[in-house]
Amino acid sequence: MKERKVFDPIGALEQFLPQIGRTVNWNGWEIAVFRTSAGEVFALENRSPHPKGGPLAEGMVSGCFLYEPLHDWKIDLRTGLVQLPDQGQVLSFPVKVEGDQVYIAAPDVHPAST
């Protein structure tokens, strides 16, 4: 039987402006939260997959993709996968919006194991 995820509130939807990343500290994680122009909300670990990368919250959002701020790597906000020709993956967090609140759940790994 699959364990049910526990979602915790991280803020009001209005705090997450469209196409602008916002950093949230939650349960030992630094998370970059993004709201697309279509209103979808995504959360990724706020760490670039590039060896010399910086915080992802400073990146640019276009559709369901994030462009890493220092090296312009294209990252799928839905999966955390870096798009070709580059390679890598960013840890993504389950997100849900209920009413005017945004909730987040833990990924399948702990920060110490990443």
Model-assigned labels for residue ranges:
Residues 1-63, 77, 91-114:
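N-terminal pre-ligand scaffold of iron-sulfur
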Residues 48, 68-71:
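Short cysteine clusters
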Residues 62-69, 82-91:
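Short cysteine/histidine-rich metal-coordination sites, predominantly Zn2+-binding motifs
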Residues 74:
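Short helix-to-coil "ATP-lid" hinge immediately C-terminal to the conserved N-box Asn in the Bergerat
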